[in-house]
Structure formats: structure tokens, C-alpha cells
Amino acid sequence: MSTAGVAAQDIRVPLKTGFLHNGQALGNMKTCWGSRNEFEKNFLNIDPITMAYNLNSPAPEHLTTLGCASPSAPGSGHFFAERGPSPKSSLPPLVIPPSESSGQREEDQVLCGFKKLSVNGVCASTPPLTPIQSCSSPFPCAAPCDRSSRPLPPLPISEDPSLDEADCEVEFLTSADTDFLLEDCVPSDFKYDVPGRRSFRGCGQINYAYFDSPTVSVADLSCASDQNRVVPDPNPPPPQSHRRLRRSHSGPAGSFNKPAIRISSCTHRASPSSDEDKPEIPPRVPIPPRPAKPDYRRWSAEVTSNTYSDEDRPPKVPPREPLSRSNSRTPSPKSLPSYLNGVMPPTQSFAPDPKYVSSKALQRQSSEGSAKAPCILPIIENGKKVSSTHYYLLPERPPYLDKYEKYFREAEEANPSTQIQPLPAACGMVSATDKLASRMKMDVGGHGKRKHLSYVVSP
């Protein structure tokens, strides 16, 4: 609801016959408002700022004539016209001359009611519904100012804190004056010190944790700005647009880098020799030289220079130790002796040959416990050994054969005339015994033959 006029919906008393359908106002106050007591009991919703504005106005005030009221816009806030009668209305507003006693009496009643309301501070004076030319009361607030000569009163203070805070943030971020961030803010129409407000514009601090450059204190920035003002630069730097916001990815979401950090670069640009604005860079660590590329041709004949030291070469492998000969049953061919002309002689039998083995050696083997050795019988035909690799392998010689052989030997020594053929070894092979028996019959008187057979049978 604007303070330009009082709408009909703000006056809580029903209007009797004050307004006709054609929008013309009547000059009879008694038919419009009723009696004086009924008007004083009503409540008028008028802003107090308008009252203060009318109290302080020193110019003479007079009431304006009442124009036509549009019935189609009762809730818009501007109920009464400001430029006189509406072009739709053909009849001019009725004006009551001040010489009439009845009209003057009713005007005094209405003005006294407005005086009491203004003195009590409930509401301020507004253009009344009566078309009055002049005011005879000495109280200044009884009549409002002329609308054509006076501007509208200021807008009321908004009670919505969100709008105030939004305006402050927009003004703070879009300010082109960099000194405005460092010095005290110029007081504006808004009151920041009123308790209960939600604006924290004047009590904020700049957080330098989200800036990419080294930290600059507010005192240093203010001193630098003062120096710039005292000694102006003959070549002023080009203006930089501070309206561009930079998003800080390192800080929390929604944090923006304020343009105050650019002040240091602007202030120190006058003296290019100063190193204060340059960030401190630590000294570079010297990069060690690359190691020499190892030579992969060192074992070939291409390497003829001494460019590579001994440190680059791998350690020499000592010569391998000769493998010790193992006692395995199947030795490697390298361990066998080499033969002349590379020809291996024919294989030899591991059995003791009667030609090269004496009787003492055989007895020694038997006494050492070699009686369990198998009985080997060579193959002899016509008194000759047929093969040196093939022989008869007989079962072990039983121990009782030694007793028989001893008995025959003693009998032969006692009576050398009686020729007793010693019994051959009791072998399990029938063919061998048959052959021995036939040979004994064929050569009964041959002593050498018996001796040979004895050696052969009992080696």
C-alpha cells in the first residue's frame, strides 16, 4: 500500500453515499463520512514517515481538490487521481465556498479529527476527501503539501533482509574502486549498525588463503595505496577490469578470488626494479649428469678404444672348477680313457679268466668271503676256449663241494697210482654235467686234462 493516498479499503468504516457510480465526489461531508464521533473511532493506516515529512515542511500548505476516483482500481494503492478530474467524468468536482457557515463548521470538525490523530502520532496527514481551498488552523500538519510541487515521500525501509544482503554482495563484487575494499565504506542510505540486521558488510576480513600469490596484509596494501595517492605516476597503468570473477578450485565451493589481490601488482608497477611483488622461487637443484650408456659391444672386436673404464664392465667370471668324477654305474663318456686312433678295443669279460688268474688268487678270494660269487664256466670245445665273452653262468657253488675237493686231494697225494677224478661242481645244469662226464670218459689217463678240468670247474 503506497502512501500517496488513502484507499477506501484502508478506511474501516463503510461509505454511505460518498461515491456515485460515475466516479464524482460530493461536497456534503455529512452524507459521506457521517458524524464526527463516528469518524474519530475509525483507524487510518497511514505510514509515520509521511507524518514526519509533513511536520518538517516549512512551506505553506493548502488542500488540493479531490479528483475522480476510479472504481476499477481500488487495491492498487493510488486510489485518488493527482491531476484533477478524470477525462471520463463530465462534471467538475464540487467546491464549497468558505463563506458558507454550514460548510465551514463541518470542515472544522474534520480538521479537528485530523489534529487529534496527528498529535497522538498514530498517523500523518493525508489529502482528505473534502475539497478545501485553505486552512485556517495554525497547526501545520493538518494540511498536506501540494502534489504537483512536492515529490513523493521516500520509500519505507524494507524489512526483508535478503534483498539488503543481495544488494550489498552485488555492490561489493562489482565495485570498480579498489580503495573501496581497503578504506571505510561510505555510509549509504542503508543502516548497517542497526541491531537485528543480517548484513555483515562492514565487519568482514579478506581471507588470503585462497590466493595464488604470497600473502599481503591489509596494512601493507593501505600504505601502498596512500603512497600512490601522494606521488602520482606520470605514466598511469591502464585500468584493469575488476569485475571478472575467478573461480578458486582449491577453496570451498562457491568461493571467488576478490580483486583486492591485484592492488599489489598495480602499486609496484611504478618501480619495475623492486622484487617485492615477485614470488620467491627456491634455487634449482642441479640435475646430475646422465650416466654413461653401457657398451653392449664390449665382448666383440668392435671395441677398440679405452673410453669405457673398468667400472662400467661387469665383473669377470672365474673359471669353472672341474667336476669331480662321480662313482655312478654309468659314467659319462668324457671320463672314459681315450684310445689310440679313436678305436675302442673289443669288450672284455669282467669274469676272472683262468689263463691269467692263479690258484692262490682264487683261494684268497674264497677265503675272503667270495664264495657267494656266481660260478662262471667258460665254453671250451676241443680243448680250446671258444669265446672270451660268452660263458656259462652257474648257480653259486655249495659249501660242501670244498669238503669233497679236499678229500680227493688227500686221496690223490696218498695213493698217486689210483687216479681219482675229482667231482665237478654240483651245478644245476644237466647239459654241463653230461659234457663233463663224457669228457672224463674220453680222457681218463690224461693228467693234464684232469688238472685243466679241475681248474675250470673250481676256479
From Swiss-Prot:
Modified residues (Phosphothreonine): T126, T130
Name this protein carries in UniProt: ERBB receptor feedback inhibitor 1
Region (Interaction with EGFR and ERBB2 and regulation of EGFR activation): 332-361
Residue ranges, compositional bias (Basic and acidic residues): 310-323
Biased composition (Pro residues): 282-291
Similarity field: Belongs to the MIG6 family.
Transmembrane segments: none
Native species: Rattus norvegicus (Rat)
A GO molecular-function descriptor: protein kinase binding
Modified residues (Phosphoserine): S250, S271, S300, S458
Main localization, broad class: cytoplasm
Assembly with partners or alone: Interacts with EGFR and ERBB2.
Subcellular location field: Cytoplasm; Cell membrane; Nucleus
Compositionally biased intervals (Polar residues): 264-273, 324-335
Functional note: Negative regulator of EGFR signaling in skin morphogenesis. Acts as a negative regulator for several EGFR family members, including ERBB2, ERBB3 and ERBB4. Inhibits EGFR catalytic activity by interfering with its dimerization. Inhibits autophosphorylation of EGFR, ERBB2 and ERBB4. Important for normal keratinocyte proliferation and differentiation. Plays a role in modulating the response to steroid hormones in the uterus. Required for normal response to progesterone in the uterus and for fertility. Mediates epithelial estrogen responses in the uterus by regulating ESR1 levels and activation.
Region Disordered, annotated ranges: 227-352
UniProt keyword Disulfide bond present: no
An annotated GO cellular component: nucleus
Keyword match Cell membrane: yes
Disulfide bonds: none
Modified residues (N-acetylserine): S2
Domain notes: The EGFR-binding region prevents binding of a cyclin-like activator to the EGFR kinase domain, and thereby keeps EGFR in an inactive conformation. Also maintains EGFR in an inactive conformation by preventing formation of an asymmetric homodimer.
